[in-house]
């Protein structure tokens, strides 16, 4: 498989006059988590649906586990797992019964389905809850059960389409641990997500998609370097102090300081991070400027997203509108 579990070359998909994918390229290394990020309507879910054989492509070529998705869809389906935004489990059944049902649907037979259900309950830390109704599970437990169901046939490639949407931070963390364990066991994961933190923590490489095209592909740190290195940030108590802060920060900055008056914030790129922070903090104190917060930060993936697409992620915009 030339070291890649998923390959897409000039992939196209049209819905009437709309091009959902317009020459989309992707290369996902074996045994890795690869993040797919993009604004709403960028083509993320369309790409996953094509790669998982749910939708036919209109142009280009794609392979999964070395198999052509257009010419060998049945063989591809035997090598993949797919989990969407919502847990596809029956709340009336127990966790064990759900997994046994999926096993029988995949023609494992009764005995093998029962054995596989027991293995997966243990693998996803659900043994104690295995005989409880899924309706009594927490959100994180349901998502882990959904992941377990997608692993019934031990697929080589797992597609996770926004798997933690709507979960609280603790439940998201539980799902992340399950994903890490799968990858440690050799599974390749293609992850679409609206949580920048999720991609940063899980993905070893990220592709940014916008208007149906891949506009960037790199490691999380490599993408962050697109918008510069470390930055010093100062938040002051009074907006009137911003001009003075800009002058102080400019003395240590590697570029022009930027001021955000709505948040009383000044920030600028720096190279000698510790010296810059120390000097700015001391000078502002000596000049009697009331500082509410001061620190250093690395660019976030949200900064990258904003730089590349011109706007923030849906998740960030929703928070700001709240």
Swiss-Prot record:
Gene Ontology CC terms, in alphabetical order: plasma membrane
Domain (ABC transporter): residue spans on this chain: 6-236
Keyword Iron-sulfur: no
Recorded catalytic activity of this chain's protein: daunorubicin(in) + ATP + H2O = daunorubicin(out) + ADP + phosphate + H(+)
Disulfide bonds: none
Assigned protein family: Belongs to the ABC transporter superfamily. Drug exporter-1 (DrugE1) (TC 3.A.1.105) family.
Originating species: Streptomyces coeruleorubidus
EC number: 7.6.2.2
Subcellular location: Cell membrane
Protein name: Daunorubicin resistance ATP-binding protein DrrA2
PROSITE patterns per record: ABC_TRANSPORTER_1, ABC_TRANSPORTER_2
Top-level EC class: translocase
Assembly and binders: The complex is probably composed of two ATP-binding proteins (DrrA2) and two transmembrane proteins (DrrB2).
Residues the entry annotates as binding ATP: 38-45
Major localization class: membrane
Function, in words: Part of the ABC transporter complex DrrA2B2 involved in daunorubicin efflux. Responsible for energy coupling to the transport system. Confers self-resistance to daunorubicin, an antibiotic produced by S.coeruleorubidus.
Pfam families hit by this protein: ABC_tran (PF00005), DrrA1-3_C (PF13732)
Gene disruption: observed consequences: Deletion of the drrA2-drrB2 operon decreases by 33% the daunorubicin (DNR) titer in cell culture. The drrA2-drrB2 mutant is more sensitive to DNR. Deletion of the drrA1-drrB1, drrA2-drrB2 and drrA3-drrB3 operons almost blocks DNR production in cell culture, suggesting that disruption of these operons impairs the efflux of DNR, resulting in intracellular accumulation.
Bilayer topology annotation: Peripheral membrane protein
Keyword annotations from UniProtKB, A to Z: Antibiotic resistance, ATP-binding, Cell membrane, Membrane, Nucleotide-binding, Translocase, Transport
Transmembrane segments: none
Molecular-function GO terms, alphabetical: ATP binding; ATP hydrolysis activity
SUPFAM superfamilies listed in its UniProt record: P-loop containing nucleoside triphosphate hydrolases
Induction conditions: Expression is repressed by the HTH-type transcriptional repressor DrrR1 in the absence of daunorubicin.
């Amino acid at each position: 498989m030339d070291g890649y579990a998923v390959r897409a070359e000039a992939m196209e998909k049209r819905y009437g006059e709309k091009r959902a994918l317009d020459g989309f390229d992707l290369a996902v290394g074996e045994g890795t988590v690869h993040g797919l990020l993009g604004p709403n309507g960028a083509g993320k879910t369309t790409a996953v649906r094509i790669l998982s054989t749910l939708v036919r492509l209109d142009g280009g070529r794609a392979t999964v586990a070395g198999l052509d998705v257009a010419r060998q869809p049945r063989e591809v389906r035997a090598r993949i797992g797919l989990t969407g935004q919502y847990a596809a489990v029956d709340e009336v059944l127990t966790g064990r019964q759900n997994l046994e049902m999926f096993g029988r649907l995949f023609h494992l037979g009764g005995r093998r389905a029962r054995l596989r259900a027991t293995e997966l309950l243990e693998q996803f830390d659900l043994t104690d809850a295995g005989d409880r109704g899924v309706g009594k599970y927490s959100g994180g437990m349901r998502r882990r059960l959904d992941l377990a169901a997608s692993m019934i046939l031990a697929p080589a490639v797992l597609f996770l389409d926004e798997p933690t949407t709507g979960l609280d931070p603790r439940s998201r963390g539980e799902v992340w641990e399950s994903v890490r364990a799968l990858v440690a066991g050799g599974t390749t994961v293609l992850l679409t997500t609206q949580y920048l933190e999720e991609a940063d923590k899980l993905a070893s490489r990220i592709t940014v998609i916008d208007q149906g095209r891949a506009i960037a592909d790199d490691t999380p740190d490599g993408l962050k370097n697109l918008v510069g290195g470390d930055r010093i940030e100062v938040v002051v108590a009074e907006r009137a102090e911003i001009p003075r802060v800009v002058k102080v920060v400019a003395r240590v900055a590697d570029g022009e300081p930027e001021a955000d008056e709505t948040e009383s914030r000044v920030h600028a790129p720096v190279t000698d991070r510790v010296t810059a922070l120390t000097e700015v903090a001391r000078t502002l104190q000596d000049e009697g400027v009331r500082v509410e917060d001061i620190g250093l930060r690395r660019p976030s993936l949200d900064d990258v997203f904003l730089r590349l697409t011109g706007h923030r992620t849906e998740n960030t915009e929703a928070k700001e509108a709240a």
